[in-house]
Amino acid sequence: MQGLEPSRVGRVGEVCRSVHKNVLTVPEHTVGTEAAAPMGDQADWMSQLCPQLWDVPLHHLSIPGSHDTMTYCLNRKSRISRASSWLLHLLGRVVPFITGPVVMKWSVTQTLDVTQQLDAGVRYLDLRIAHAPEGSTRNLCFVHMMYTKALVEDTLTEIAEWLQSHPREVVILACRNFEGMTCELHDYLAGCIVNIFGDMLCPSGEVPTLRQLWAREQQVIVSYEDEATVSRYDQLWPAIPYWWGNAVKTDVLLRFLETMKGQGRPDGLFVAGINITENLCYILLHPVDSLEEMTRRSLPLMTEWVCAQQPGQSPQCTNIIAGDFVDADGFVSKVISLNCKLLSP
């Protein structure tokens, strides 16, 4: 895939900005006791969608997501996860003052905290959950090469509180990874989800529309990547497919995504991940680089690809598009703007 000419990058960005202005409208209803947010405020973009889109199932809409949502709270003292390679653990023991900072640079995929991501318009949260060794019995955390200090129960509560302030917004929570989780811990986590979100939860079934969710006062779909647990809780949905290219180079990643599109989209909700993936060899050979710098270098090609996508029900349509550093280059706005392509002329 060839790099974009500067003039072409400008045209792509202009198209996305123009479309974004047309897909949102300020509805006549009010949210709670306050008027709906003004146009362009992405904290309430779902409630501001054109009424024509209220009856479109969520898996046919274009929805922005964040990859490895919780990595913003990692720091240099975060512990390396037990699932990481033996070489990384060895380096962590021998030269911890070097290993910690280097690993952190490649573990952090987001700079906005979870509330800021929701305010920015992100509606798919990628929650990699783990039980860290030597942690207390039920203190579940998040993981991406390193363990977070943030606890799962606190984060779910923060999300629920945000939703109470935005009663017509809908979030999709993908609970994944489950490093160190036992059957008892899965039941504990499922219980936390049910207790914290309560009637906000949309039970597993046919993918709903926004109008249906609003009528039922439901705001949360929880995808859970453990089949045994899903079978025990009606409130949990099966794992949402995530197209992961596992590629360091942007052009390789985008070719993978195009190949997946060519094979036909899944029937329900699914994610196209536009996240670059490093490996340990690459990290060791590029000690002064970082995932953020590598991601930002890839933005021109990523932007072109995103703006070319089409939501809907056709085999090559996209649904959720998730990326790293979602605050960069108007990523969220561009994904939301794709919904304009669903509007009748």
UniProtKB/Swiss-Prot annotation:
GO MF annotation terms: phosphoric diester hydrolase activity
Name recorded for this polypeptide: PI-PLC X domain-containing protein 1
Entry's localization field: Cytoplasm
Alphabetical list of PANTHER family matching this protein: PI-PLC X DOMAIN-CONTAINING PROTEIN 1, PTHR13593
InterPro entries: PI-PLC_domain (IPR051057), PLC-like_Pdiesterase_TIM-brl (IPR017946), PLCXD1/2/3 (IPR042158), PLipase_C_PInositol-sp_X_dom (IPR000909)
Protein's GO biological process: lipid metabolic process
Domain of life: Eukaryota
Keyword Membrane: no
Residue ranges constituting the PI-PLC X-box domain according to the UniProt record: 52-228
GO cellular component: cytoplasm
One family name in Pfam for this protein: PI-PLC-X
Alphabetical list of PROSITE patterns matching this protein: PIPLC_X_DOMAIN (PS50007)
Tissue specificity annotation: Expressed at highest levels in brain and kidney. Also detected in stomach, thymus and skeletal muscle.
Native source organism of the sequence: Mus musculus
Alphabetized UniProt keyword annotations: Cytoplasm
